[in-house]
């Protein structure tokens, strides 16, 4: 089994080297959100409840040091459950999440409008990743039929972007990956996908949200960029989420402008 992102030490979670993100000596947003999603799911969720929405607030840089997770139920009813999660480091809250769970039931008859969307095909060599890669991503840019590993197809392009992702490392040592953790992880990629333009990636996200009408089936999650709007250094981006069967929900990310040389990924 691949090395996990975190090891357990008492009530703390100790980050490995692969938790570092592309914005300096701090954890990546997908790592922070993935761990919060893992902690919320571990707090005790009825399997008949659908994880319908997860919002992650990235309050400050999370250092490459041990963290603790705190969870609290804010609302629990017959058809709804709202759980908050907090990431604490050195006694300070560094990130938080809010997860909304809705009870599944009979689905109404009839058709409802939704825009027609298609994802590029799944990559054929998705098992070809390096031992030092935190996750697999296959990006598509100006040519949606010709992708490449990593984000090379996004470089200096203002075209619509797509990505297929595969999380293959456990979030926490000794605990298998779950569909909810995959959703929590991939939501952060929305920021890069939607805010990357002709000048490269010039925005860092302060949050992200994922919504899902059902859990993803399989290891692969896809993202199709839908919009980017920005004014005076503030931007909002939105994407549609896919699994191998089709659309499952949406994602969004709010972001702030950054210097051109601030984004320094070490693994893509």
Question: Which residues does each PLM region occupy?
Answer:
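Terminal targeting signals and extreme-terminal segments of soluble enzymes
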Residues: 1-268
């Amino acid at each position: 089994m691949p090395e996990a992102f975190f090891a357990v030490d008492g009530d703390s979670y100790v980050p490995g080297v692969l938790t570092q993100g592309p914005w300096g000596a701090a954890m990546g947003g997908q790592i922070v959100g993935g761990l919060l999603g893992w902690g919320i799911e571990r707090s005790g969720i009825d399997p008949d409840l659908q994880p319908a929405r997860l919002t992650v607030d990235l309050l400050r840089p999370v250092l490459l040091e041990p963290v603790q997770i705190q969870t609290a139920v804010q609302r629990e009813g017959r058809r709804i459950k709202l759980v908050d999660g907090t990431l604490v480091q050195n006694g300070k809250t560094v990130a938080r999440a809010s997860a909304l769970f809705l009870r599944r039931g009979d689905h109404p008859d009839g058709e409802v409008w939704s825009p027609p969307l298609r994802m590029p095909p799944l990559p054929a060599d998705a098992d070809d990743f390096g031992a030092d890669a935190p996750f697999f991503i296959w990006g598509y840019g100006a040519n949606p039929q010709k992708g490449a590993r990593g984000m090379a197809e996004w470089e200096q392009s203002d075209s619509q972007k797509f990505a297929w992702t595969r999380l293959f490392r456990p979030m926490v040592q000794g605990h298998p990956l779950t569909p909810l953790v995959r959703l929590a992880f991939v939501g952060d990629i929305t920021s890069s996908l939607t805010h990357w333009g002709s000048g490269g990636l010039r925005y860092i996200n302060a949050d992200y949200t994922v919504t899902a009408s059902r859990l993803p089936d399989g290891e692969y999650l896809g993202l199709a960029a839908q919009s980017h709007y920005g004014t005076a250094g503030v931007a909002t981006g939105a994407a549609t989420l896919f699994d191998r069967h089709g659309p499952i929900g949406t994602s969004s990310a709010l972001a702030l402008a950054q210097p051109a040389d601030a984004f320094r990924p070490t693994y893509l």
